[in-house]
A protein has these predicted regions:
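Short glycine/threonine-rich loop/turn motifs
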Residues: 156-215
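Short His-Asn-centered micro-motif
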Residues: 54-57, 147-149
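Long, charge-patterned amphipathic alpha-helical coiled-coil/hairpin "stalk" segments used as oligomerization
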Residues: 71-178, 182
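Short amphipathic alpha-helical/adjacent loop interface patches that line ligand
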Residues: 38, 125, 198
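Intrinsically disordered, compositionally biased charged tails
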Residues: 207-238
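Residue-level signature of catalytic and energy-coupling elements of molecular machines
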Residues: 53, 145, 197
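N-terminal cationic and glycine-rich segments that engage phosphates or anionic surfaces
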Residues: 1-39, 45-50, 57, 61-104, ...
């Protein structure tokens, strides 16, 4: 949770109480949100859909990349480039450019160029890899996006909604639950909480791409995470 002065009143139904000046999220609501998100994401994956993982804040970058790579899904963890969804054709052209530069580097053509040009091209390549490496294999817009910190990733959410792409997102006490179709009330600042949730969504993808998942199996992972979630929802250091 966050300090009381930073809360969003729309989050009131998801708040258990307060500890000093910090609001504490209701873990029953967190568990319910996790169950709903798990069911949705696993069904998207089961039907051959893709889920784009998005988390550009420092606490989320590693967890988002690791979770997405584990379940074979694309991710954005450095910077959301405007138009990543709404101007996808242009973004794909930048990915193609990145792959062309990588090929030049790999086969030695870049080394044959003048030093100044090599420096410029390597700088361009480094920037492209930083921003686009996680979506190099994303050939079309995703069927859903999973977002850590809906306030920070508001541009990504806005683009998703313009294209009617459902959003799964973490909801801390300062967030707007109306921004997402599937909200998970949770601490979005603590690294342990972020990793837990990113891994949880990756598990849902893996379950969906594997054997059919029963309702009981869908609920099991969320129940197993209930204890760590209690710590995850505790107040993060400001």
């Amino acid at each position: 949770g966050h300090q009381k002065r930073r809360w969003n009143p729309k989050m009131k139904p998801f708040i258990f109480g307060a500890r000093g000046d910090i609001y504490i999220l209701d873990l029953k609501q967190s568990l319910m949100g996790m169950d709903q998100a798990y069911t949705f994401v696993s069904n998207v994956a089961k039907n051959g859909g893709s889920v784009l993982f998005v988390g550009t804040k420092k606490q989320a970058q590693e967890a988002v990349a690791d979770a997405a790579n584990r379940c074979g899904m694309p991710y954005v963890n450095s910077r959301w480039l405007g138009g990543m969804l709404t101007n996808f054709v242009t973004i794909r052209s930048r990915v193609t450019r990145m792959e062309e530069l990588e090929a030049m580097e790999a086969d030695g053509r870049m080394a044959l160029l003048p030093k100044k040009e090599q420096i410029l091209l390597r700088k361009e390549l480094s920037k492209l890899q930083l921003n686009l490496n996680g979506i190099r294999n994303m050939k079309r817009v995703p069927d859903a996006i999973f977002v850590i910190d809906t306030n920070r990733e508001e541009i990504a959410i806005r683009e998703a909604h313009r294209l009617n792409i459902p959003v799964v997102g973490t909801l801390d006490t300062n967030c707007d639950p109306d921004d997402v179709e599937y909200g998970i009330p949770a601490n979005d600042d603590a690294i342990r909480s972020v990793k837990l949730l990113a891994d949880f969504i990756a598990d849902a993808v893996v379950a969906g791409t594997g054997a059919p998942v029963s309702a009981e199996e869908m609920a099991a992972p969320a129940e197993a995470e209930a204890a760590p979630a209690a710590e995850a929802a505790a107040p993060a250091a400001e």
